[in-house]
Amino acid sequence: MDSEKVGVNYPEQFHRISRTDRRRKKKLDRAVLFFDIDGTVLSEITKEVPVSAINAMKAAQQAGHLLFINTGRTICSIPPEIRRLKFDGYLCGCGTYLTYQDEVLFSSSIEKKRGKEILKKATECNLGVFAEGQEDIYYPERMSRFDGLESSRRYFHRRGMGMEQSIEKGDFIYDKIFLYEDERSDLKS
């Protein structure tokens, strides 16, 4: 609507801001889209990436949008079927690792000595624990009473991970831990 047709005279400054805002809007037409892996990109039923999802993601990239995986998993545990999709970047390990176009922009790991202390304390408190790093996943040597931990161990063992080194050895650097607790756990220590 033309301002003069309705009897309103906006100052020239308003028109300049409007043009600037239009330019900003054009820049904002490009979005960054974040996708989780489990149950989002990778079907929990078929354990595959649906063709419809692949087509939608390709269309989004062709439209100029950036696609990122945003997952609690660490970078080493991203399945090959996800990596083949050519995402623009990965935000992994609950925010501990960020890449964009194959360049690491941020990485935060727990220092080795401190990591050993944390795992030792978790074990002393009778918690189920496994550690996730950029290189591998680390499980206890012995089977755990926690079904979730053992289910995770089986899943990653099938993918060739979590078998090289146990948390008891502790000669590794990791980014995060996953804890399990129950009535036998000591949460007060």
Q: Model regions: which residues?
A:
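Small/polar loops that bind or transfer phosphate-bearing groups
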Residues: 45, 69-70, 179
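A general structural motif
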Residues: 28-30, 64, 126, 172-174
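Conserved acidic, metal-coordinating active-site core of Asp-based
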Residues: 121, 127, 132-189
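Asp-based phosphoryl-transfer active-site loop
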Residues: 31-46
